[in-house]
Amino acid sequence: MSGLILKLGPKERILVNGAVIENGERRSRLAIMTPDANILRLRDVIHPEDAKTPVRRACYAVQLVLSGDATANETKHALLRNIEELSQVFVDMDSRQLIDTASGALSRGDHYHCLKSLRSLLPREERLLAVRN
């Protein structure tokens, strides 16, 4: 089995190419076989008013592509700039690896994995901002 594997909880919703799909009563596992399908877990959605930090803004931009509200071409250059800026702030090795993974995924047009890597930076960003305040 190849492709993206999604593990869904009961009643969890996902957006697949613009269609909202809700899981049933039990946990399930889905294999997405179409390589360029746009997938977004609705539990992971960042609302526009919450996109106030650099990582959240980058996540939100990727999310717009996955939801179909923006095209990959419209966001690619701005996202690459955002990711480059993040690489100047997050200098530890683990964060750099996540940033490199996000950048590589974006270059391949793999927005799902780009978002996944960027979301992994959110707790680190929160810690940095907490120290600053």
Residue ranges and their predicted role:
Residues 44-56, 63, 67-69:
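Catalytic, metal-anchored helix/loop core of enzyme active sites in primary metabolism
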Residues 19, 25, 73-81, 129-133:
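Short flexible/disordered coil segments
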Residues 23-52:
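Short, surface-exposed, low-complexity cationic segments
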Residues 62-94:
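Mid-chain, well-packed structural core segment of small domains
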Residues 11, 19, 35-37, 67:
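Generic structural motif
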Residues 83-133:
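C-terminal charged interaction modules
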Residues 51-54, 58, 75, 98, ...:
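Helical mechanochemical/support elements of P-loop NTPase systems and associated helical scaffolds
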Residues 1-27:
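Short, charged/polar N-terminal "headpieces" of proteins
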